[in-house]
Amino acid sequence: MLIDYLFRLPLNILFLFSHSFSSFLLPFQLHFMQRAFVIGLIAALLAGIVGSFLMLQRLTLLSDAISHSVLPGLAIAFSFGIPLIFGALLASIISVIIINWIRTESRLKEDTAIGIVFASFFGLGILLISVIQKENKVDLNHFLFGNILGITSEDLQNTSIILAIILLFFISCYRQLKCYTFDPIMAQTIGLPINFLQSTFLILVALTIIVSMKAIGVILVLALLVTPGATGLLIGKSLEYVILTSSIIGVSCSFSGMLLSYLFNIPPGPTIVLITSLIFFILFLIINKKDSTTDSKLF
């Protein structure tokens, strides 16, 4: 199958270029693709904003734990017929509480607590999904790998609400969050609400993960959160520039990934992730080569 697909890939490319520009506009005329593009662009935009702060606060591992911790919440919510977003959000909040509890009540470090909770919740989620699929004969693998082409109008509405909440928080608390991100001790000294900022930010991380999960699934969601932010940090000179760059990269990669997935009939989630990773490595090699050249001129 793989050899056959690779053999037909050049033919598909030639077929696309031989047709008019209307072939590229076709996906935008389909309702399910329109919803997919909107969800993907919102997820990428939020991931770029939230991911920049995640990188600077060195919370990448914690975000990975949260992304996998939502799995049992999704499974339980599906079983009881309640909105999946509530189950996922509750599971992520519980995971953060347990991580902080283990860290404060024992001599274990935070990364150890994160690893324990990450493995426990993910294992529980896989077990619950297996049991549910066996009893109800339904396919829940889209929790793991995403199902952006199966987006409903309700999903679009919930995602728009989440976008509004997150943007409202960042607009109203940007200066406080920026101060806390770069110097938590000074932020506490001048009387900023540290606990509120940290707790609210983690909840918004969970909401961003839930939105992104629709696009690329639980397993790959960390890549969408981290890679655009890391790319922005490579070339950014200020926090505002990093946020802007990572958001533009995330949105561009999401758009191009979904378009390529439709044109070549390949999964959209992995395609988006691979494009973001490719851009990161290209910029990394260019910047690294430039730095090496500069260093060689200094000596």
UniProtKB/Swiss-Prot annotation:
UniProt-annotated location(s): Plastid, Cyanelle membrane
One protein family per Pfam: ABC-3
Transmembrane stretches, start-end: 13-33, 36-56, 79-99, 112-132, 151-171, 201-221, 241-261, 267-287
CDD domains to which the protein is assigned, alphabetical: TM_ABC_iron-siderophores_like (cd06550)
InterPro entries: ABC_BtuC-like, ABC_TroCD
Cleavable signal peptide: none
Keywords: Cyanelle, Membrane, Plastid, Transmembrane, Transmembrane helix
Principal location class: plastid
Topology term for the membrane: Multi-pass membrane protein
Record family assignment: Belongs to the ABC-3 integral membrane protein family.
Protein name, entry field: Uncharacterized membrane protein in ycf23-apcF intergenic region
Organism annotation: Cyanophora paradoxa
